[in-house]
Amino acid sequence: MDVDTAFLNSTMDEPIYVKQPPGFVNERNPDYVWELYGGMYGLKQAPLLWNEHINNTLKKIGFCRHEGEHGLYFRSTSDGPIYIAVYVDDLLVAAPSPKIYDRVKQELTKLYSMKDLGKVDKFLGLNIHQSSNGDITLSLQDYIAKAASESEINTFKLTQTPLCNSKPLFETTSPHLKDITPYQSIVGQLLFCANTGRPDISYPVSLLSRFLREPRAIHLESARRVLRYLYTTRSMCLKYRSGSQLALTVYCDASHGAIHDLPHSTGGYVTLLAGAPVTWSSKKLKGVIPVPSTEAEYITASETVMEI
């Protein structure tokens, strides 16, 4: 659901004055100014004011804000929980039945002017599909295709693995890039994919992110390879199966540093729910230099437990 002119629903927290806009100038008092009553697009505090407004509104109708994810709200009913995910002026509503969804929709439309955009098929860059049996799949197929087009990579060259072992990223013979913007742009797109719906590239992207300040030609070539891999496998998705046991399954592991990356270690974890990952990470262990590999394993396990 989309809230119409969302920012205008909030009220200003301090006096803000604007010039009279063309076509609305008071001829008798052309030097007068207007005082803004509601938040307006373009004001630095407008997003915060709207967020506070929608937060208070949802709490008034019985929703609780998730302590860890402030954009997620939930309310318990006898038929099951209702969830509302808020992203600026877009609300994603999940209810246990169409009847309860219609009831929540009526509550919200009494408070805001809103448009029901129908069953969700895309949200925050994710392609979302819900089958007739309740299975939900998430993919980044459209986002990846757009990123590949913008980066002008060779999409006809199929790539089945994200990195090439024969091209070490830590070699110093490769020349520095004169313009680092293309590299930073591609890595930014890869980071979005790695953090959103493609856990399989978490390690390669974490590795490439270490060279954002002074990338070399080998790094740009490797980043393009990861993007080609994403394009080749763009139909891959996360599938959450209806009726699966809602129990977390967690895996974590650590390496004791690659030969070119010693003495640091890389730690990673993945959390599965309903048959697919819900959280994951791969990053260099900072601040400590584990002596035995066992120490790296314990550090990674500790960070995994803290995430859960």
Curated annotation (Swiss-Prot):
SUPFAM superfamilies: DNA/RNA polymerases
Keyword Disulfide bond attached: no
Superkingdom to which the source organism belongs: Eukaryota
Cellular component GO terms, alphabetical: intracellular membrane-bounded organelle
Entry keyword set: Transposable element
Record carries keyword Metal-binding: no
Disulfide bonds: none
Pfam families: RVT_2 (PF07727)
The name this protein goes by in its record: Putative transposon Ty5-1 protein YCL074W
PANTHER family (UniProt xref): GAG-POL-RELATED RETROTRANSPOSON, PEPTIDE SYNTHASE GLIP-LIKE, PUTATIVE (AFU_ORTHOLOGUE AFUA_3G12920)-RELATED
Species of the source: Saccharomyces cerevisiae (strain ATCC 204508 / S288c)
